[in-house]
Amino acid sequence: KNNLISEDIGPGNCLIDKWMRVMSKKDFDKNGDFAKSGKVDQNILNKILDHEVYKKSNSKSLDIKDFDITFAKGLTLEDGSATISDFTSQLICNAINKYKDNFLKIIVCGGGRKNNYLMNRIAKLTKLKIIDIDKLGFDGNFIESQTFAYLAIRSHLKKNISFPSTTGVKLASTGGEIFKNF
């Protein structure tokens, strides 16, 4: 129960946002409204879930560059948003379910927390309570930048920032260097 764990599953809301920019003049699917009005293409979803990248999601970290949205080509804006949203929720739930017995709720941050469709899918697939970090008094738009600031301070103080249970390193270690431009 006192073990520190972490996962970075890669795309978060990025694939949905990319789909919206490619298929419309919108930057994101506000509240997941387009996904809600679309229909998941189960054949495409099953095929992409069987793909190597998805199988790689058992690794500690995936990057947005590990994914693309070409699998949704030919779908309507709404059906593509629904299919990509379901794919994203499956990736997130795959990571969560590895540790599900270790926690009772999920605290979410970043833009995806405002996508009701995505959050409802994750809650349904994990059967866990989803909490928007804003409700705990934090601004969910800045958690990642604050995390990097925190890690920079720990690194500056020569404190560990990487652990076997978070990144798979053999021994806990610090990281990074400070450079000065004169």
Residue ranges and their predicted role:
Residues 1-34:
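Glycine-rich phosphate-binding loop of actin/hexokinase-like ATP-binding domains
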Residues 25-105, 116-124:
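A contiguous, well-structured pocket-lining segment that forms one wall/lid of small-molecule binding clefts
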Residues 23-28, 96-99, 153-163:
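Short helix-capping/linker segments at secondary-structure and domain boundaries
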Residues 131-182:
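Glycine-rich phosphate-binding/hydrolytic loop that grips phosphoryl groups
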Residues 104-115, 145:
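Glycine-rich beta-strand-to-loop/alpha-helix junction loops that act as flexible
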Residues 18-22, 43-50, 121, 148-151, ...:
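Alpha-helical scaffold segments in soluble metabolic enzymes
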Residues 1, 5, 108, 115-121:
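Acidic, glycine-enriched active-site microenvironments
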